[in-house]
Every structure is written in C-alpha cells, then in structure tokens.
A protein has these predicted regions:
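N-terminal accessory/pre-domain segments preceding catalytic cores
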Residues: 1-106, 222-292
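Alpha-helix capping and helix-loop boundary segments enriched in small/acidic/polar residues
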Residues: 4, 82, 146-149, 173
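Sterically constrained small-residue positions within well-ordered secondary structures
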Residues: 18-20, 62, 142, 177, ...
C-alpha cells in the first residue's frame, strides 16, 4: 500500500484504526486529499469490516482541520470494537484451517487458491443486476459473510487473507479486449518476483492451475486482458508514480495446463494431472518448486 499511496496515507490509516479501537472519532491526518483517498481505499484492502462501522465526517468537504480528521460512527464504539474482534477471529479460523505454520509464501498462496476454488461461489445474480442498475452492497466483508461474491470481492478477500498470513499481496484490475469489461484479480510478490493470481476464475474448477502464478503475458492470454489497462490497487496508481509491477517470471508455466491434486512441504513438490492423447488420458505430473 505504501508503494502506491505513500507514507502520509499509511500513517493516516494507522491513526484511524487506533482511533476506532480507542472509541474516538478524530485522528491525525495531513490534509483533505490524504483523508479522501485513505478513507475511500484502505478499509476494503486492510480491514474490510470497517465500512460497516464508520463513515466519512458529516462535513465531507472539511473533514480535516489543522491536521485533525474526523469520522462518524455507524454503530456504538463498543459494538464496533467487538465486531472487529469477531471478524479477526473469523479470519484467523480460515487461516488456521487452510495453512500450516511452516508453509512458505508460495504454499500459502497455493493452499488458499485451492480452498477458494472448492469453497466459494460466484454471485451471478449480483453480476446480472449490475448490468441494469448501480449495486452498492458488494464488499470484501460481504464475501466473507456469505461465501459468494463478484470479482472485486473475491480477489480482495484472497489478497486480504494472504496479507494476514504475511504474504505481499494486493489487487490488480484491467479490461478485456473483446468487450472492454473490467475485471479484478490478485497480484502477489513472492521471492521478490511478481505474479498474477485469479481466484475468481478458479472458483468451481476444483483446482485448475491455469490462473495461478501467471505472468503478464499469461494474464492477457486468459480472456484477452489488455496489459496497458492493468493498474495496481486502485485508480490512484494511474495518477501517481509507483514501482514497476511487471510480472515476467514464467517459473510456473508447467502448471498452467494441469489440475491440482496435492503438494508436499517436505519435498517441495506439487502433484497434479494433465489430460493428453487422443482419448483424453490423464497423466500424473510432479512439479518441483524448491527455492519457493
């Protein structure tokens, strides 16, 4: 987040969270610009439940006066703190169910990718509604509570879980070439290299690895996404300087046409299957990810 939004916004976010947990309604913030972007972008990525608990200041255009920002409570402060703690336990429960302490960052990303493909569903009803009207109820938090969602909810939830597990992760957005439709997926940095992961496209596949640890080229290939439209985290990154987020390491190319079966932390191998031959025979394949 700091690479895209800068230190001032990250500091304001930390101050906001401290104020919420203390039951206050003011916090230190540099200026209105910092406030607007931080309040608009950070909760969904960094503490999804917060949108249910607080809102902007009553006087939205003058939310920051002399370096002090304010916000409004949607629920009593005590209830907010209790709900944040309950949400934290929910997230901890998912991570404890899916991950082991000894997992590497790659193994965490893989285990959660498979978990998403097997446990969550795409919300087609909401997707269809969005073609006809503005929908304002989608959020990462809704996805965790219902188990269904659309792309921005799903990818935000996947990236949020990875961040809580210590993996560098965020969201990436872009447009398809054939209909210009927007889409959001996850973007990770593992072993100092960047990769695209699309947990939305993985839903219901029961472990197809074609959307896991993709390069820019592979991301573009899967449903004709246009690399020049890619942007990280939010529209803010389109307007402000940030590091290059090129994903060009194709170490995981051998997995993209395989179906997952299992992986071994001890041997650093992924066991999977591939369909080949005239009669569609299934052949076992083992991928060595030593070093990851």
């Amino acid at each position: 987040m700091e690479e895209v939004f800068g230190k001032d916004m990250c500091d304001a976010w930390s101050n906001l969270v401290d104020a919420v947990m203390a039951g206050e309604n003011t916090f230190a913030c540099k200026d209105q610009h910092t406030y607007d972007w931080m309040m608009g972008q950070f909760p969904e990525h960094c503490l999804p439940i917060l949108r249910e608990l607080i809102d902007y200041a009553y006087d939205r255009e003058h939310s920051v006066i002399d370096g002090v920002a304010s916000f409004t409570w949607l629920v009593p402060p005590g209830e907010a703190k209790a709900r944040i703690e309950a949400f934290g336990k929910q997230i901890e429960g998912i991570l404890n169910e899916v991950l082991e302490d000894e997992y590497s960052d790659l193994e965490k990303a893989l285990a959660l990718y498979i978990y998403f493909s097997e446990h969550y569903e795409y919300d087609y009803d909401t997707y269809m509604q969005m073609n006809d009207k503005y929908v304002d109820y989608t959020s990462c938090y809704r996805f965790f509570q219902t188990g269904i969602g659309i792309c921005h909810e799903i990818s935000s939830a996947y990236s949020y879980l990875l961040m809580q597990a210590g993996v560098q992760a965020t969201s990436m957005s872009g447009n398809r070439g054939y209909d210009k439709a927007g889409h959001q997926w996850s973007f990770v940095r593992i072993n100092g290299k960047n990769y695209h992961i699309d947990p939305t496209y993985a839903l219901g596949t029961r472990g197809e690895l074609r959307y896991f640890m993709m390069t820019d080229e592979k991301r573009a290939e899967e449903d004709e996404y246009i690399p020049s439209t890619f942007y990280a985290v939010s529209h803010y990154s389109r307007e402000n300087p940030h590091p290059d987020y090129t994903a060009d390491d194709d170490t995981f190319r051998p997995l993209w046409d395989k179906d997952f079966e299992s992986f071994s932390h001890e041997t650093h191998t992924i066991r999977c299957w591939t369909e080949s031959g005239y009669y569609g025979e299934w052949t076992e394949f083992e991928f060595d990810y030593a070093g990851y």
